[in-house]
Regions:
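Solvent-exposed loop/turn segments at secondary-structure junctions
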Residues: 53-56, 100-104, 132-136, 160-164, ...
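C-terminal subdomain of the subtilisin-like protease fold in secreted/lumenal serine endopeptidases
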Residues: 125-129, 150, 181, 235-271
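Short helix-loop-beta-strand segments that form the rim/entrance of peptidase-like active sites
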Residues: 85-103, 110, 239-251
Length: 271
């Protein structure tokens, strides 16, 4: 069974047996990672980020924009994503594949090319997609399926602005079964997770995580936190096929008991 089928089936198993969710152990994933530290993976985990570039001179990668070879990030989005992932997985090999100059200029062609390169050239273990497309794309879906078949875990944001976009309307690629969809939450004064009208919630959401990053906020940053957590888990010996189950066991329930169609398995407490 290839990883894409495994992830699809894992989602199906969990969501159709949501009533059993209370039996899952309420593990603090970061503590579990510390306990797993002696059995580290031999190879460094590679995280590919498809985004707006990165202003860190130490970040490897390439640009898929026509006429531009530089990784320079003119909007700062990709740089913040890189930083959050590195905070969560400091030993990971982070690769930036620049696919757009601004969050409003996300085009399919460079993204599709970058997805294939992520697994064929850079051998990505995890791929971070902190952006959305409103319409489904066969070419992009094929690229996602291909990347999953090569063993990559793909993490994407559910999106923002639920009032203007429509409650429960999750954009692509998070809406595909093969992708782990992440929604954002805010933290209140007590450090507890709270939902916000700023974030999208719906059927394609698998997990929620805090969405703040300095003065910015969005499910893009929630996604980066989950990507960092996944990379750290892989680095500590968790198999890619077990990642979804591992995260589900660690999530703090939100909304209806167990898995639900708004918050998925719930909140992952990630710094």
């Amino acid at each position: 069974m290839n990883p894409a089928e495994r992830l699809h089936n894992m989602k199906h198993i969990f969501t159709t047996n949501a009533g059993r969710a209370s039996a899952l152990p309420a593990i603090l994933l970061l503590l579990a990672l510390l306990l797993c530290a002696p059995c580290r993976a031999e190879e460094t985990v590679t995280v590919c980020i498809l985004d707006s570039g990165c202003n860190d001179n130490h970040t490897a990668g390439e640009s898929f924009l026509e006429g531009s070879e530089a990784l320079t990030d003119t909007v700062g989005h990709g740089t913040r994503i890189c930083s959050l992932i590195r905070e969560g997985a400091p030993e990971a090999n982070v690769v930036m594949l620049k696919c757009f100059d601004g969050q409003d200029s996300v085009n399919e062609e460079p993204i599709v090319a970058a997805l294939y390169a992520a697994v064929d050239v850079y051998h990505a273990d995890v791929i971070n997609l902190s952006w959305t497309l409103a319409d489904e794309s066969d070419a992009l879906h094929e690229a996602v399926l291909y990347a999953c078949s090569k063993g990559a875990v793909i993490v994407a944001c559910a999106g923002n602005l639920s009032l203007s976009t429509g409650l429960g309307t999750i954009a692509y690629p998070a809406a595909w079964d093969e992708v782990i969809g992440v929604a954002g939450v805010d933290l209140n004064a007590q450090g507890e997770a709270e939902t916000s009208l700023w974030y999208l919630y719906g059927k394609a959401v698998d997990f929620c995580a805090r969405g703040d990053c300095g003065d910015e906020k969005g499910s893009s940053y929630s996604t980066a936190r989950v990507t960092g957590l996944i990379a750290a888990a892989l680095q500590n010996g968790v198999a890619a096929e077990q990642i979804y189950e591992y995260l589900a066991a660690a999530a703090q329930d939100m909304g209806e008991p167990g898995f639900d169609d708004r918050y998925g398995w719930g909140y992952l407490e990630i710094p």
